[in-house]
Structure formats: structure tokens, C-alpha cells
Amino acid sequence: MSNLGISECPSLSIESACGSGSVSFREAYANVAAGFYDAVLVTGVEKVTHTGTEWTTTYFSYCSDFFYEGQAGASFPGLFASMARAYLNEFDATEEDLASVAVKNHDNGLSNPKAHLRKKITIDDVMNSAVVASPLKLFDCCPFSDGASSVVICNEQFAKDHSKDYVKVIGLSLIHI
């Protein structure tokens, strides 16, 4: 930060595998809501495509909790599949309902020229793609990608002072699995 002329600026690095963005957002929100800061900049970056799929898959497998998950043979797709199965059961949803999320996400990617996957897919495409970890199929899962994003989390007064258009956070949760 000193290279930018910013001194005495606290920073925090959060590593939470596939949940790093969500955990970082929540941490920033909690600090602003508690009144510790008026505004917090959350930035996330991932650069992995240069390493190749095999190396990246191996590396990511070390990011889980070895004692509780690794020894049981759990993988991130397996853990996400367990959560997806629980969701399907609790909300009486179908695998086609899950597939509609992938279709929506791909549709959003079509409007972004920098999206990793710019391909229209259908529910049938998702349903007929290879099973990764039931009920998740290939098109339900994200590929390793490079990307970055930032968001400013601030209190309402800061938002009003700096922008006429802002979004209010009306709900936020974090669960432990």
C-alpha cells in the first residue's frame, strides 16, 4: 500500500478455497456493521490456468481439512455434491432445477466478453454431461479459471456521500460444514 501513497492501512488475507470471496465479503461487512470502518475494499484474485489441470487439481486437494475431510477421501466436488443433495431433499427440488442454475450462469457469461466460458447450454446439455460427484454434473461445476474482482463495502452514509446508486446488503449468512 505504501507504493500507492497509502500509509497505516490495515489489510487481511483470507484463504478459504472456493469460499474465499464469500468469507472476505462477510468479514468486510461485519467490520463495517460493527463500526470499525466506514468503508472496506475487498479484492480477490486467482491465477491458476498456467499451472495445468493436473497440478491445480492436486494443489486444491490440499486445501481441505486433512483430518476431517482428506482422510475420509472427500474432495471439494464431493463436499459440494453433499450440500447439493441436501438442498434437493430439503426443498423438494430436482436435478433439473440445479441444471437451471448452470444454464443461467452460462447465459450471463454470454454477455461478458471476458468470461471464461461463453457458450449457451440447455438443461438437457447439463443433464447429459458427465457426472462429477452425484448429483453434480460437469456443467454444474466451474472450471479452473483466472480472474479478479473487487467490491467496496461501506456504511450507508459513506455510500450516500460517494454514489447515487448503491446496493444494500439485506441478508448474509455463513454456515460451517
In which residue ranges do the predicted regions lie?
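Condensing-enzyme catalytic core mediating Claisen C-C bond formation in acyl metabolism
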Residues: F66, E90, S100, V131-I175
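Short coil/turn connectors at secondary-structure junctions
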Residues: I6-P10, A34-V40, E96-D97, G147-S149, ...
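Internal metal/ion-chelating core segments
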Residues: R85-S145
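Conserved catalytic cysteine-centered active-site region
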Residues: M1-V40, K47-L79, L117-P143
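Active-site-proximal alpha-helical scaffold in enzymes
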Residues: S16-E46, P77-S111, V151-Q157
